Design a protein with these regions (language model features):
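Amphipathic, hydrophobic secondary-structure cores in small proteins
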Residues: 13-66
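Right-handed parallel beta-helix/beta-solenoid
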Residues: 2-12
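Short, flexible, glycine/charge-rich loop motifs used to bind or transfer phosphoryl groups or to couple energy/partner
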Residues: 1-2, 28
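Core SAM-dependent methyltransferase catalytic element
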Residues: 73-78
Length: 78
């Protein structure tokens, strides 16, 4: 992660399943400014499809997706 990808806000939705991670991500993004970066941590495998779909639907940029031991990390730029 470079300097421009430092999250302004972090959202932990570990242990929650669809639709909670997407709903909470959308809510958090709605409270952020243009250009801000949100880091989301989730462990629901459905988020691997849901987060890119959400980003496309609401017009934000999915900067990065990583997976480590069943935990997914998404960096989203508003």
């Amino acid at each position: 992660m470079n300097e421009t990808e430092t999250p302004n806000r972090r959202l932990d939705v570990l242990g929650f399943f669809c639709p909670i991670p997407v709903h909470e991500t959308r809510k958090a993004l709605g409270e952020m400014q243009e250009g801000d970066i949100l880091e989301v941590r989730a462990d629901d495998p459905e988020t691997l499809q849901d987060m890119p779909a959400l980003c496309n639907r609401i017009g934000v940029q999915l900067l990065d997706t990583t997976e480590d031991a069943g935990e997914y990390r998404f960096l989203i730029k508003k």
